[in-house]
Amino acid sequence: MKHIKLSGRERAVLRYIDWATGTNGDELLDCTKIEPEDLVDVLNGLMEVGYVEMMPYAEHTDLDTFREKTFEVNPSYALELRAAMQRL
């Protein structure tokens, strides 16, 4: 099992992503209260390592498009991410 370390902002974003159906960027912005630029950076970082996927699929997102996209947890990492979220 891969040992995953998450920052506080990554935890906040993952906490609000619906692990079954995904969550759109606008909802994440409202729930996390993170500035849009920072939220885009966190989402791009999570997508870069493969923990989060974006629908429709793309390698990264930007300020202009992230609000309409849906973000979901990559099922391949779901168990490891749940364990990482429980650790402090």
Indicate residue ranges for each PLM-predicted region.
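Short alpha-helical segments that sit at the start of domains
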Residues: 1-13
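Alpha-helical hairpin
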Residues: 5-6, 34, 73
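Short, locally clustered residues in the helix-turn-helix/winged-helix DNA-binding domain
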Residues: 15-19
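Short, Lys/Arg-rich nucleic-acid/phosphate-binding segment
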Residues: 56-68
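Short amphipathic alpha-helical interaction segments
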Residues: 33-49, 53-55
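Short, amphipathic alpha-helical interaction segments positioned at domain boundaries
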Residues: 66-88
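Short acidic, hydrophobic short linear motifs in intrinsically disordered regions
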Residues: 22-31
